[in-house]
Amino acid sequence: MSAASILGMGACTPLGVTAASSAAAFRAGIVRFREIDDSAVEPVRASYLSQIPWGRSCAERTLELTRRALLDLVRSFPLDSASRLAAWIGIAESEPEAVAVERALTGHLHAAFPGLVGPPTFLRHGRGAFFAALAAAQRALLARDCDLALVGAADSLCAPGPLERLARERRLLGPELEGVIPGEGAAFLLLARPGLVSRARGTLLCCATAREPRHRRQDAPNTAEALTAVFHELRADPTTQGRRADLLLTCETGEPFWTNELATAYLRNVPLMPEPFTRTTAAEGLGDLGAAGGAVMTALGLCWLARPLRPPVPESPQSLLMVCGSSDDGHVGACLIECTTKEEASR
């Protein structure tokens, strides 16, 4: 599949209302894990945007996060109203929240982007949703169904509905130090079809998705078949040319299930991985971002790599970012992005 250009990005997280401020705070080790006292659940720590009043629904919180992330994106790259723009958005898997979120975001997207080609496409794939959206957008750009693609994801696990569900499932982090810290966020990329622009923030080289039959919501041991296949597909893609990722970011929640899955897939795809092997997980600074994980971590990674990591060398390869994520229902995805330094982007 042909590469797609990344023209701009925007994000909103509890660490900052822009991609740049979120990335800087995360890298500095700042966290916003606050104790909340909700009558519906036991006292729990969560990572939430304090500017949104507590008690708002999942749809309301997701809409406000999306609104702020899109403002950040438009500042980074003003849209040309003459370009044909289509949208693919990743959202939560759960039915009650997903319906309300779709309704809220559809209205906002059409108001914010009057030239949107058709209705937005929503993918209810949890932590795997962003990668499914990315793959669908890349196919549409290649087929010239649109000139520009708005691709992103948004979610909030800090609303009453998701919090109650996590409490019922005993997923909340407790005294035994196993569980999740609920988080929330939104992030979006603006992609262009190959050859449309001469300058970009980065290049989406390839994206792969798969479905894991032994997912978290069933009882058989997870053997990481889907994540292994996704990594193998990225390795085999001609655009990667056998390169290793320089930076690996994951949507992991801090639960052992996901750590074991990644370790298994890593051992089967060592040539693709950073050397020495290191990774940064969403849980370290933002908790469980749900469906927003892939998009937010991609935006942070683009910020972190949008500067020279070493003295410039003629014809040296650009930094390679890999992001991956898996949902509770087995939707798995990963992508490889070649990042442009600030100097190169301004030429």
Where are these regions (language model features)?
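Conserved "HGTGT" condensation-loop signature of ketosynthase/thiolase-family condensing enzymes
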Residues: 1-127, 131-135, 139-145, 154, ...
